[in-house]
């Protein structure tokens, strides 16, 4: 009997805060498919997870960020093609760039209070990442 090996598709991104202030808003994107989530994208060959996150954030939002890689949360789920999806999220703080939206990927970008973001994020495991990020930052809701 032949056992097919599950392929793992890896993406990396970040929970992006507008600043390091405790009450900083968080960036939530609405993908063209209608899901509300964090910026992320596929790891390209020879990239580190951090490099992927920085590149995807710049490509999709125009923002330049500083990553805090001491915070690192992974989510896993199965895709309809039978592959496993693994997302790695860091925390990021905006440090520059000019905000613009990659229109073939996103339909909206929203800066929200974390408590509002929690209410609109599509997937529970992404909401859990936000909870962990807030705890890590010791920031009030």
Q: Model segments located where?
A:
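Residue-level signal for short segments within beta-strands and strand-turn junctions
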Residues: 16-18, 30, 93-94
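Short, flexible turn/loop "capping" segments at secondary-structure junctions
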Residues: 29-36
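Unchanged
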Residues: 43-69, 73-129
